[in-house]
Amino acid sequence: MTFQNKKILVAGLGGTGISMIAYLRKNGVEVAAYDAELKPERVAQIGKMFDGLVFYTGRLKDALDNGFDILALSPGISERQPDIEAFKQNGGRVLGDIELLADIVNRRGDKVIAITGSNGKTTVTSLVGYLCIKCGLDTVIAGNIGTPVLEAEWQREGKKADVWVLELSSFQLENTESLRPTAATVLNISEDHLDRYDDLLDYAHTKDKIFRGDGVQVLNADDAFCRAMKRAGREVKWFSLEYEADFWLERETGRLKQGNEDLIATQDIPLQGLHNATNVMAAVALCEAVGLPREALLEHVKTFQGLPHRVEKIGEKNGVVFIDDSKGTNVGATAAAIAGLQNPLFVILGGMGKGQDFTPLRDALAGKAKGVFLIGVDALQIRRDLDGCDLNMTDCATLEEAVQKAYAQAEAGDIVLLSPACASFDMFKGYAHRSEVFIGAFKAL
């Protein structure tokens, strides 16, 4: 990819935007910076990092009118905005940091494992990275999981990696055309980000872009959208909780199997919940696709401790177990968390719903939830979508109130589950802050 005689505008000045500016400047590209809102102190801060950098703010169209050839977008900005659509129609190119990394790894020959899905992608990315490291590979873990990919590349000073393990969101895949992963997965598709996409099919089509190239596809046989992503002539590894597949769960014995071969008992997997069995199957399939030995992978799975805020037991009081799934920010994630827990539940739901339909939670909660506690700006919408179910629903002004009321109703053996199915920004700084408040409320009981 050449940028000779090209002017590039980087839009969005968070971590990803800054990493793109640094990469492009290092490669001698003429680059400027844009953000819809720029405070003087932020300009001063970034200006210290990049001498002479030109800043634009206000309307994006006005910035683009300054002769830019390429728009490098941070993932939080949709390329479907009218100003960006007009820029493309006039011959402008739009790309993101994953497209820039793709050019690097394609030229250098690094292996890439790429992971997306509505739910579980951070857990699978962390597990795959952990397994690769444990098996001795020089491994880079980056992307939506936290470290921008170009920041990770800069830290390595251009050194080739044995494997890149990338968590990719639909936002990052929108303008990624050249990535050709050695192995890739779409773990599942459920309603999320429907405030950005036309419908669920539109969202699924964006996820499907991860399968460009001729690498191994790892697909969920239990998900109709994922089944439809199978490409002709490609090697595919299927995983399933419902059917005999390449990787599957034998429910009678509680063992994961590969074909007819025993792999590991679910009781030996340190991660809570049945949905994590699918995460393990996907991770092992991805790692085998880059040549790692199965026996070593299964031994290392047993020592992986998982991630905070993802179906994580935080404590127990008088026999009532409290589980933090604050990262459950959409309906699919919450449904999976509920399905993976066997004891009676009191579930705390609510926050910013992102345009989701909450009716799929009706079946998930039926027969398992003894009570539902609603918080946040979209509590009323959730109540409407669950109306008519045989559920005891209680509106709460705060998360602390929800914890107190749930505990007051619970008995020994019950679970109080925070799995909101919503984003957190109406009441909290983020899902981690929401988790902190939940843990604090538990400790205060």
UniProtKB/Swiss-Prot annotation:
It catalyses: UDP-N-acetyl-alpha-D-muramoyl-L-alanine + D-glutamate + ATP = UDP-N-acetyl-alpha-D-muramoyl-L-alanyl-D-glutamate + ADP + phosphate + H(+). One of its GO terms (molecular function) is UDP-N-acetylmuramoylalanine-D-glutamate ligase activity. It is an enzyme of class 6 (ligase). It holds the Pfam family Mur_ligase_C. ATP binds at residues 117-123. Keywords: ATP-binding, Cell cycle, Cell division, Cell shape, Cell wall biogenesis/degradation, Cytoplasm, Ligase, Nucleotide-binding, Peptidoglycan synthesis. SUPFAM superfamilies: MurCD N-terminal domain, MurD-like peptide ligases, catalytic domain, MurD-like peptide ligases, peptide-binding domain. It is found in: Cytoplasm. Transmembrane segments: none annotated. One of its GO terms (cellular component) is cytoplasm. One of its GO terms (biological process) is regulation of cell shape. InterPro entries: Mur-like_cat_sf (IPR036565), Mur_ligase_C (IPR004101), Mur_ligase_C_dom_sf (IPR036615), Mur_ligase_cen (IPR013221), MurD (IPR005762). Gene3D superfamilies: Mur ligase, C-terminal domain, Mur-like, catalytic domain, NAD(P)-binding Rossmann-like Domain. It comes from the Bacteria. Its main location: cytoplasm. Pathway: Cell wall biogenesis; peptidoglycan biosynthesis. Its EC number is 6.3.2.9. Belongs to the MurCDEF family. PANTHER family: UDP-N-ACETYLMURAMOYLALANINE--D-GLUTAMATE LIGASE. Cell wall formation. Catalyzes the addition of glutamate to the nucleotide precursor UDP-N-acetylmuramoyl-L-alanine (UMA). HAMAP family: MurD. This is UDP-N-acetylmuramoylalanine--D-glutamate ligase. The lineage of its organism: Bacteria, Pseudomonadati, Pseudomonadota, Betaproteobacteria, Neisseriales. The gene is murD.
